[in-house]
């Protein structure tokens, strides 16, 4: 049976399904599934906060993937609303699992520190950013990730971007980006002390859009 596939901008009703994709992909370390769901929701709302472009794929009316991006100089229309939502999620997380929440906040702080270093090393500080790309495990292998990435690339190019970048790491499918023409522009290897909060290696991938 042929599935019905639709691409369109993010809508609020997509949030729960997309957060569930993030949970199943990256937020599985705590036995408390309610906490894991909140942590994934926190990640999604943060990505929405720093983005100005969205594209969601629906397969048979079910959200199965999302790409978010920000072109250099874009306004961030949802920043205030998303920041408040993130604070609310963090409060609920802390009530459920205070230790896990503290570890999550330590991860965010360390991740931001490393990402800033990667961006400085890459020379792409004025490029546009792909802030999130996630596809449900049930929809992988169908070319959906490539379509979503192309949509974000086309958007930032239409805004005059001469380059784009994204962050990824050894917990993600970084080889996908190499197959799509992005090149590794910077790398960071976590030291022994950092490995309890950070992935083994973290990368910045970039693409030249000036041609």
What are these regions, as identified by a protein language model?
Residues 4-20, 71-72:
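A short beta-loop-alpha structural element at the N-terminal edge
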Residues 33-59, 64, 68, 89-92, ...:
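Active-site rim helix/loop that mediates acceptor-substrate recognition in acyltransferases
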Residues 135, 141-154, 179:
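Conserved acetyl-CoA-binding loop-helix of GNAT-fold acetyltransferases
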Residues 146, 170-187:
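Conserved active-site alpha-helix within GNAT-family acetyltransferase domains
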Residues 165, 183-201:
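Conserved catalytic-core motifs of GNAT/GCN5-like acyltransferases
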């Amino acid at each position: 049976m042929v599935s019905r596939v639709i691409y369109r901008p993010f809508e609020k009703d997509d949030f729960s399904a997309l957060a569930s994709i993030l949970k199943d992909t990256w937020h599985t370390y705590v036995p408390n599934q309610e906490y894991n769901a909140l942590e994934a929701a926190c990640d999604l709302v943060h990505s929405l906060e720093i983005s100005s472009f969205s594209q969601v794929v629906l397969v048979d009316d079910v959200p199965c993937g999302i790409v978010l991006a920000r072109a250099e100089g874009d306004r961030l229309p949802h920043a205030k609303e998303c920041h408040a939502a993130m604070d609310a999620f963090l409060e609920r997380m802390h009530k459920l699992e205070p230790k896990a929440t503290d570890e999550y906040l330590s991860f965010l702080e360390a991740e931001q520190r490393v990402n800033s270093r990667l961006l400085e090393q890459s020379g792409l500080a004025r490029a546009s950013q792909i802030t999130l790309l996630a596809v449900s495990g049930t929809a992988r292998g169908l070319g959906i990730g490539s379509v979503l990435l192309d949509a974000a690339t086309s958007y930032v190019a239409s805004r005059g971007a001469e380059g784009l970048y994204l962050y990824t790491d050894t917990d993600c499918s970084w080889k996908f980006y190499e197959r799509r023409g992005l090149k590794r522009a910077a790398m960071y290897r976590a030291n022994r002390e950092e490995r309890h909060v950070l992935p083994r290696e973290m990368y910045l991938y970039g693409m030249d859009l000036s041609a």
